Amino acid sequence: MDLVLTEQQRLLAESATRLCADYGGPKRLRALRGAAAEMDVDAWRATIAAGWLSTVVPEHHGGQGLGVFDLALALEQAGRQMLMIPLNEVAAVARTMSGAVDGSRAEAGLADLLRGALIVPATAAAWSSGGRASGLHYDHKAGVLDGTIAFVAYGGSADAFLVAVEYGPQPVLALVRGSQISVATESNVDGSTSSRLTFAKVYVPAESVIATGAEARKLALQLNEFLMLGAAIELVGLAAAALDVTLDYIKLRQQFGKPIGSFQVLQHRAVNGFIDIELNRSLAYRVLAAYDAGEHHPAMVSAVKARASRGALEITRAALQMHGAIGYTEEHDIGLYYKRALALSARYGGELGQTSRFSALTLEPMEASP
């Protein structure tokens, strides 16, 4: 599999690097946290104008007809600069809606998504990656939805939600307007948010149902895998940025009359972090390429997310330690990377959950002893 970037992909990566540097970074993140803002509206508008959402949408639906691999080039930079935007979530929804067999039902919502008039976070991750949906039920006869979904990213900024329901006669994937839903939002350690959605006899008209049956199940599983891969590549970018900040620090910090970066023990820790980042990046992009080609194994998606979650946490913890006591203060920026890693590593399944999913998808069940 050829993982060499094309000229178009190199230009996309360069553009993403510049845009994310302009709209991200520790200073901007602190300002957003101080304002208790769930997302960076200006950064979101800039990414919409750049056309990043359309990379994962086919041309006949108004997109560029590229792939998740191409979007990942932007997501890695968004992770590196700690942008507070729902790029991964809304792109996953756009890709899912464009893949529906009955595209006419999704067409209007998809057009609004691509031009930034509609923010639709994904909630389908609750359906098949750990049972976070509690009693979610769709009454096919009455067309109403009841139940709760927890841990929804950017729920407070949403205009609608893409909801997957497996309980009942058959699976359903529907676009539900946010005005009908009770949304309770709480802050995470990094300043991002998680929302709990409550559906109480929410009417879902037939035209809002994107897919049903086996098609709904297939689309929701693809959506979950998209979300996992997107979060993983953001974590790779985040870890790389934290390591770069740390390398700059240990080159300058003096102890015993010399830079602490000259001490072998810190050199070894830095090299271990670098190797981990490169391995995780390579694995992520290889699986992303396979995902776009429809040749990936679902277990490899979990492997990517598990490794990226573990790697980001280990590298940011090491970064704190190599900064010494100042790294643990609120005033120093390195702590922001660790807090971001804590929140993002848990989103869509952390190391433990993804390792369990990997095992379930690859290991044969053991027979009971006689």
Description of each model-found segment:
Residues L83-G103:
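N-terminal glycine-rich flavin-associated loop
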Residues D146-I181:
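A short core secondary-structure module
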Residues L66-G67, G130-A133, Y154-A158:
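Short glycine/proline-enriched turns and hinge-like loops at secondary-structure junctions
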Residues R115-S128:
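A short, Trp-centered hydrophobic/proline-enriched beta-strand micro-motif
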Residues A133-L136, F151-V152, R177-T212:
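Flexible, small-/acidic-enriched active-site or ligand-binding loops
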